Design a protein with these regions (language model features):
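Beta-rich, blade/repeat-based domains predominating
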Residues: 1-2, 6, 40-61, 91-122, ...
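Short loop/turn segments immediately following the C-termini of beta-strands
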Residues: 8-10, 66-68, 76, 86, ...
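Asp-box/WD-like beta-propeller blade repeats and closely related beta-sheet repeat scaffolds
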Residues: 9-59
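A short loop-to-beta-strand structural motif that recurs across blades of beta-propeller domains
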Residues: 20-23, 70-72, 132-134, 180
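Short loop/turn segments that connect beta-strands within beta-propeller blades
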Residues: 26-30, 75-79, 137-141
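Beta-propeller fold detector
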Residues: 33-38, 81-97, 143-157
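Internal hydrophobic scaffold segments of catalytic domains
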Residues: 58-86, 119-125
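Lipid deacylating catalytic domains
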Residues: 126, 135-136, 140-168
Length: 180
């Protein structure tokens, strides 16, 4: 078993200092067995790579970019990475403010939540500052233009604004920041 630890390389949200990376920890030995560094073009100077899901079927890791809307795909077969749905409406914040515990939260957060349904080979994603849950089949994910990929994305639900998602036993579970 492995643990993937994401280093955003963006301290205090002040910009990426060098390529974001994943540390791969072997849980049996408790040792770092490798470092996966994102390729140029997979991130922007203001990126904040936030959350990830490992797809053992496709041998890829899917990540969200919460600062510069988009998803990042890391291919474990050839150690390359690329962006998809970059600055696309499905990965962008839908609102400028949320109400959290009765107080306005005015920092729009782009693509944030991500969940992987390994039974149906579906990747779900959601902007934190938004109410739309989107999905794409993992077989449709490829290095392609936004327009080509956008045709394969579907809106599956209107939800609360989540800061956390998981797929478990046939269900997508989402947090709801505004209704705690």
């Amino acid at each position: 078993d492995k643990l993937y630890v994401l280093d955003t390389r963006n301290p205090m949200f002040e910009g990426v200092v060098d390529a974001p990376r994943l540390f791969v920890v072997d849980l049996a030995s408790n040792e770092i067995e490798g470092t996966l560094i994102l390729s140029e073009g997979a991130y922007h100077p203001d990126s904040y790579i936030n959350d990830l899901r490992v797809d053992e079927k496709t041998n890829r890791i899917y990540m969200t970019d919460s600062a510069h809307a988009g998803l990042v795909v890391y291919n474990l077969d050839d150690n390359t990475s690329y962006r998809i749905l970059d600055n696309h409406k499905t990965t962008k914040a839908e609102v400028d403010a949320l109400s959290i515990q009765g107080k306005p939260f005015t920092m729009p957060v782009q693509s944030d939540g991500i969940a992987l349904d390994t039974l149906n080979d579906t990747l779900y994603f959601h902007a934190l500052s938004g109410y739309s849950l989107y999905a794409i089949n993992t077989s449709d994910i490829e290095k392609s233009s936004n327009d080509v990929l956008a045709e394969k994305v579907r809106k599956v639900a209107t939800t609360g604004a989540p800061d956390g998602m998981i797929f478990h036993q046939g269900n997508v579970y989402l947090a709801d920041l505004e209704k705690q």
